[in-house]
Amino acid sequence: MAKGKKLSFSFHTYQDSVTGTEVVRLTPPDVICHRNYFYQKCFSNDGSKLLFGGAFDGPWNYYLLDLKTQQATQLTEGTGDNTFGGFLSPDDDALYYVKNVRNLMRVDLNTLEETNIYQVPDDWVGYGTWVANSDCTKMVGIEIKKEDWKPLTDWKKFQEFYFTNPCCRLIRIDLKTGEATTILKENQWLGHPIYRPGDDNTVAFCHEGPHDLVDARMWFINEDGSNMRKVKEHAPGESCTHEFWVPNGSALAYVSYLKGSTNRFICSVDPVTLENRQLTEMPPCSHLMSNYDGTLMVGDGCNAPVDVKDDGGYKIENDPFLYVFNMKTGKHFQVAQHNTSWEVLEGDRQVTHPHPSFTPDDKHILFTSDVDGKPALYLAKVPDSVWQ
């Protein structure tokens, strides 16, 4: 199929069999569809349109779904789209994404014209999700030396890659000129680069790998490469995962858990003082994301983590629910079942992961699940009781 092609969907609405919550399946369950990474912008500012990845014609491409007309427009074509890392610009006029692990592209959403903003040098490979600053004038990303790179198509390869100590660099790209600057270069696996919202001088990144082997996952560094600092000293047996900025920039939030314990905790760190706080205990969720000011958080119940080396120390019962946490009252709510399989599909480790986040008005939760067949997108209504 070609860019600009329209697809008509028929949304399917049902009530969750346990909670009674209204859930809407947005995409057909016979075609692989998934949301982008949970902290990347996927909704238009008014909440009426949704960016997603879909495999309607073989390759995984980007589509923009009009939630009012139930019609999706194809935005990209061909093979090689990183359909997890892309995002909508702050003014909703463009899509940014990486193609063929090498080309940073901008798609004009009015004309669908594509511009190649930056090309990864031949001896490097673009890795993971690249994130823009609040004004969308620059972006941080990770590149891995081409000779060190291996496709991470399952969790065994993910674990093995950690021990290779690949040569990685954290880069900053000027989105107007395409000029790239190296912030940090290390012979260590780097990932998850994220500008602090509203503060271009602070960049978060992680030491990637099995969570029980990484001695200190989360780091801050100034945009010019100075003042690199450890976000948290891990306690013995502690893993810290799935860090993200609260969208107003007030804190970096993350999940913490200990080997041999089924308890998990929502934690945060002050980006200025580096004070770490344990906010609340939670059910065994994998991913977390907050609303704009961090007053609500949403998580996806999960099974024992697959991204650890010694999985015998992390056995938990599978939890198939989405949870909302009211961070003011300390209460949490079982919203609906996602019932996803968490399985690797077509060489992708994350396409069946729920990756929940809120709609712009905080009234619904977007998530991915393969409960009805292939991965599809869903919206679950946030219960009124959450605000009480």
Swiss-Prot record:
Main location class: periplasm
Substrates-to-products reaction catalysed: 4-(4-deoxy-alpha-D-galact-4-enuronosyl)-D-galacturonate = 2 5-dehydro-4-deoxy-D-glucuronate
One Gene Ontology cellular component annotation held by this UniProt entry: periplasmic space
Keywords, sorted A to Z: Lyase, Periplasm
SUPFAM superfamilies: DPP6 N-terminal domain-like
Annotated localization: Periplasm
Pathway(s) annotated for this protein in UniProt: Glycan metabolism; pectin degradation; 2-dehydro-3-deoxy-D-gluconate from pectin: step 3/5
EC class name: lyase
Record-linked Gene3D superfamilies: YVTN repeat-like/Quinoprotein amine dehydrogenase
Gene Ontology MF terms: oligogalacturonide lyase activity
Function: Involved in degradation of pectin, which causes soft-rod disease in plants.
Protein name: Oligogalacturonate lyase
